[in-house]
UniProtKB/Swiss-Prot annotation:
<dbReference type="GO" id="GO:0005524">
    <property type="term" value="F:ATP binding"/>
</dbReference>
<dbReference type="GO" id="GO:0003723">
    <property type="term" value="F:RNA binding"/>
</dbReference>
<dbReference type="Pfam" id="PF00696">
    <property type="entry name" value="AA_kinase"/>
</dbReference>
<keyword id="KW-0808">Transferase</keyword>
<comment type="function">
    <text>Catalyzes the transfer of a phosphate group to glutamate to form L-glutamate 5-phosphate.</text>
</comment>
<keyword id="KW-0418">Kinase</keyword>
<feature type="binding site">
    <location>
        <position position="54"/>
    </location>
    <ligand>
        <name>substrate</name>
    </ligand>
</feature>
<dbReference type="InterPro" id="IPR001057">
    <property type="entry name" value="Glu/AcGlu_kinase"/>
</dbReference>
<dbReference type="GO" id="GO:0055129">
    <property type="term" value="P:L-proline biosynthetic process"/>
</dbReference>
<dbReference type="InterPro" id="IPR036393">
    <property type="entry name" value="AceGlu_kinase-like_sf"/>
</dbReference>
<dbReference type="GO" id="GO:0004349">
    <property type="term" value="F:glutamate 5-kinase activity"/>
</dbReference>
<feature type="binding site">
    <location>
        <position position="153"/>
    </location>
    <ligand>
        <name>substrate</name>
    </ligand>
</feature>
<keyword id="KW-0963">Cytoplasm</keyword>
<feature type="binding site">
    <location>
        <begin position="173"/>
        <end position="174"/>
    </location>
    <ligand>
        <name>ATP</name>
    </ligand>
</feature>
<keyword id="KW-0547">Nucleotide-binding</keyword>
<dbReference type="Pfam" id="PF01472">
    <property type="entry name" value="PUA"/>
</dbReference>
<comment type="pathway">
    <text>Amino-acid biosynthesis; L-proline biosynthesis; L-glutamate 5-semialdehyde from L-glutamate: step 1/2.</text>
</comment>
């Protein structure tokens, strides 16, 4: 199954606070430089990369001279504000030495729970990745409240992996992976090299609390892997202090714990599209569009749409029917009903002239279409 790692073309890499801050003694720039070298090697090998970086609060604590992690929200937010500056600058300067651009992206739970903001975040991240820029993502600790925080960056990393449809989520931690017993208490504990993410037996061995610098223990990493698995993604939980760990993972070495989904990404997404959203409208397709969608498995372009029915917003589910009313497919639209009315029957290169902007060349992308 390690071919799922070596064959992955889009990685989300999450690095924990303890690994970035030398266990609390400020940012460990030497360690960061080593990871950047490995991520640059991934990039040069044609792998698209997104980095989820913890460490803002921990770096801020060090700068402020705080020994223990505060519990008060306003103190945590103050530490995050101080630490985020240095954290992003450190990543930027280190990647720049290798000629790679980075982009800071701060997210809150609201950004991913609101459909419109979710789509905007997804479009931005996909554009950055396609441009060869490395997005550096963290939770926007300065503005979140207890009610809307992700809780830990493991969860954030899994949601980002789903957002960008990553093939692989790599969670770098201060442990070598998941063990069948607590290695701190049991010298006979064995590393679990591979398991299904939904295996209930993993819950019994994922106990233990987070470190003093972070919020996420092994239980949160297991939950993150299960969240990524819902969209068909694979997860590796692995020790960040293992020498050249990313290089060795890419080469197929059996490091850490590989947690696998129960179905492929495509099957998972199609199942979600088929059964989890309410239909908001209908697009009537001409014969050419019906063939393009159902036989050629292409995206639905505005030029092939004869009529728009119902009221829907960008990102909502619509039914695609032929001119006799027979359902052909369903999918998530890139444009609202009002916008679709203006561009139906028109070629893609006319969208900007008609609307003043372009949210996508297609009305429904083929990745967001499921045939019925």
């Amino acid at each position: 199954m390690r071919d799922k790692v070596t064959g992955a073309r889009r990685w989300v890499v999450k690095i924990g606070s303890a690994l970035l801050t030398a266990d609390g003694r400020g940012l460990d720039r030497n360690a960061m430089a080593v990871w950047v070298e490995q991520m640059v090697a991934l990039h040069c090998a044609g792998i698209e990369l997104v980095l989820v970086s913890s460490g803002a609060v921990a770096a801020g604590m060090s700068r402020l001279g705080w020994v223990s992690r505060p519990s008060a929200m306003h103190e945590l937010q103050a530490a995050a504000s101080v630490g985020q500056m240095g954290l992003v600058q450190a990543w930027e300067s280190s990647f720049a030495l290798h000629g790679l651009q980075t982009a800071q992206v701060l997210l809150t739970h609201d950004d991913l729970s609101d459909r419109k903001r979710y789509l905007n975040a997804r479009s931005t991240l996909r554009t950055l990745v396609e441009l060869g820029v490395v997005p550096v993502i963290n939770e926007n600790d300065t503005v979140v409240t207890d009610e809307i925080r992700f809780g830990d960056n493991d969860t954030l990393a899994a949601l980002v992996a789903n957002l960008v449809e990553a093939d692989l989520l790599v969670i770098l931690t201060d442990r070598d992976g998941m063990f069948d017993a607590d290695p701190r208490n049991n010298p006979d504990a064995q590393l679990i090299y591979e398991a299904r993410a939904d295996d209930p037996q993993l819950d019994a061995v994922a106990g233990g609390s987070a470190g003093a610098l972070g919020r996420g223990g092994m239980q949160t990493k297991l939950r993150a892997a299960r969240l990524a698995a819902r969209s068909g993604g694979h997860t590796v939980i692995v020790g960040g202090r293992i020498e050249r760990v990313l290089d060795r993972l890419r080469a197929g070495e059996r490091l850490g714990t590989l947690l696998t989904p129960d179905r492929s990404r495509k099957a998972a997404r199609k199942q979600w599209l088929a059964g989890h959203l309410q239909m908001r409208g209908t697009l009537v397709l001409d014969d050419g569009a019906v063939k393009a969608v159902s036989q050629d498995h292409k995206s639905l372009l505005p030029v092939g749409v004869k009529a728009v029915q119902g009221s829907f917003r960008r990102g909502e589910m619509v039914v695609c029917v032929d001119q006799s009313g027979r359902e052909v497919a369903r999918g998530l639209v890139n444009y609202s009903a009002l916008e679709a009315q203006k561009i139906l029957g028109q070629p893609t290169d006319a969208i900007e002239a008609l609307l003043g902007y372009v949210d996508g060349p297609e009305l429904v992308h083929r990745d967001n279409l499921v045939l019925v």
